[in-house]
């Protein structure tokens, strides 16, 4: 099974400690529970940074990494105590006794005692690393501990003089995926690909968009991915021109396209695939003409992405393909170079070509100005060109209301890239063949 080992979490914690100053502590807080309505909560989703260092999926938890000097450090987890009554109602808790063995931390303390314990752990240190402003409850806990230290000089207490945000360091770490992470992302891609394939096979005119949403989520669940990594987009007809359309409530009509942007979350990591296909299984000529431009853009990107390139550089090649294609169809008019200089493509391709992918679907990490950061092995990103012709656009009528995006997930390797989501078809003739075959079953 693809998952992150205890040893991997320990390596990550050690890697952060090595970047900390001597005489310091890093505090990483779990996400709080979020109320849905009245006394009902949303399904709990752990803070991605906390998960990155622990793999622990309970609220009311804090990881403390203490670096005394360059050779001495230790880890402390504050977490909820075992409580028979609470566990009958709401599920099992790990508790303090099992945490060191399960999670690989040095010791565990009760979260209910954090106000009595945290200031003692911080006493005498010079620096505290804390993501101030992320969670109000976390700021209250940290500020309370520091205030106790500042007021305790007569008891030989001293507070850290410096607070540093650990997020820039941690998010740079998260940008480069380990082999274990890539294996999990590969599985997330496989499950997501199977769900998109299922949607193509099940699609029929007269169904509603939410029917395909249900088929997709069913396939996620069948393979151990309980939740989507973001709100599923199923946009048929003109809805495909709305980038983050999530109502998913319209009837899918014969002759329309349907754009599906959906990904599963597997072991905390996100899949993210988009496919666009005809509701009736057969592209019209106008749909195919737009689709071919987007597909060429994707295939060119997949050839170009490798170490030493950048999102900015590859985007430039994609824009040229798009503008040239739109000129040939009469959607744009003029010289290709002049149109590119004028950003004439922006009304039809208004989002970025790629974003980082990992524990978050829009994962953390610096892109550089205009996404000019040079790509390196271990980076994982999406490739998602799209063209969206608004229903009221002043273009030839047959193209109005067509929205097409095609998206794959890749990891940059030493020699190029690996497509993590190649197993779901995207060539028009392959899509049509798949949908025709499904209708015969």
From Swiss-Prot:
It holds the Pfam family Peptidase_M24. Homotetramer. This is Xaa-Pro aminopeptidase. Gene3D superfamilies: Creatinase/methionine aminopeptidase superfamily, Creatinase/prolidase N-terminal domain. It comes from the Bacteria. The gene is pepP. It comes from Escherichia coli (strain K12). Binds 2 manganese ions per subunit. Keywords: Aminopeptidase, Cytoplasm, Hydrolase, Manganese, Metal-binding, Metalloprotease, Protease. One of its GO terms (molecular function) is identical protein binding. It is found in: Cytoplasm. The lineage of its organism: Bacteria, Pseudomonadati, Pseudomonadota, Gammaproteobacteria, Enterobacterales. One of its GO terms (biological process) is proteolysis.
